[in-house]
Amino acid sequence: MLTIALSKGRILDDTLPLLAEAGIVPTENPDKSRKLIIPTTQDDVRLLIVRATDVPTYVEHGAADLGVAGKDVLMEYGGQGLYEPLDLQIAQCKLMTAGVVGAAEPKGRLRVATKFVNVAKRYYAEQGRQVDIIKLYGSMELAPLINLADKIIDVVDTGNTLRANGLEPQELIATISSRLVVNKASMKMQHARIQSLIDTLRAAVESRHRG
């Protein structure tokens, strides 16, 4: 049995057509089903529907053989115990700092609001900058507006939400896309099966971008 961990939303919607190229199609719509384990048209393949931030954990600990996770999640929650053989080039965005338009750069310790705490610590440590990290889970744009933080670190797609709230994207930390991740033990035990799937997905990604 091959188990693939996916999260609902944009990543799932973009991944399903790629899996279909490999003949893997869920037997029911994951967006409408309450089931968390979804069979597929291949009897030996099933999908696990989990939180995006949990995908690396399921794969690393062998509860899933493969998964699809955003690079932002892998950077924040760790992908050290995983193989990352393929950039699926889906769910593309940028991980950036942002601040109030026209605001002066604060002197002294910088206050940064983000849900990407580990990424923020590494980023500012590399700059030798002293920061106070404030962990938030949503509505990041609010923090600089009410003087909770000087800057935020967040995923930016169009930047419309930032601009609507008087903020502007500033420093690029990383370009983000979704990656296929594989459990190391599974890669050894089911090498031919998994490598075949990787090759098929790679061809589908390349074909999509050529087209």
UniProtKB/Swiss-Prot annotation:
Q: What is its main location?
A: cytoplasm
Its signal peptide is none
Asked if the Swiss-Prot or TrEMBL record annotates the protein with the keyword Nucleotide-binding, the reply is: yes
Per its UniProt record, what Pfam families does this chain match? HisG (PF01634)
E.C. no: 2.4.2.17
The family database entries (InterPro entries) matched by this protein are listed as: ATP_PRibTrfase_cat, ATP_PRibTrfase_CS, ATP_PRibTrfase_HisG, ATP_PRibTrfase_HisG_short
Which locations, inside or outside the cell, does it occupy? Cytoplasm
GO BP:
L-histidine biosynthetic process
EC top class, as a word: transferase
Keywords from the UniProt entry: Amino-acid biosynthesis, ATP-binding, Cytoplasm, Glycosyltransferase, Histidine biosynthesis, Nucleotide-binding, Transferase
Q: In which pathway does it act?
A: Amino-acid biosynthesis; L-histidine biosynthesis; L-histidine from 5-phospho-alpha-D-ribose 1-diphosphate: step 1/9
The molecular function terms in GO held by this entry are: ATP binding; ATP phosphoribosyltransferase activity
Q: Which reaction is this enzyme known to catalyze?
A: 1-(5-phospho-beta-D-ribosyl)-ATP + diphosphate = 5-phospho-alpha-D-ribose 1-diphosphate + ATP
- Which top-rank group of organisms is this from? Bacteria
Q: How does it assemble?
A: Heteromultimer composed of HisG and HisZ subunits.
Q: Which HAMAP family match?
A: HisG_Short
Let me see what the UniProt entry remarks about domains: Lacks the C-terminal regulatory region which is replaced by HisZ.
Q: What does this protein do?
A: Catalyzes the condensation of ATP and 5-phosphoribose 1-diphosphate to form N'-(5'-phosphoribosyl)-ATP (PR-ATP). Has a crucial role in the pathway because the rate of histidine biosynthesis seems to be controlled primarily by regulation of HisG enzymatic activity.
Q: Which family does it belong to?
A: Belongs to the ATP phosphoribosyltransferase family. Short subfamily.
Protein name, entry field: ATP phosphoribosyltransferase
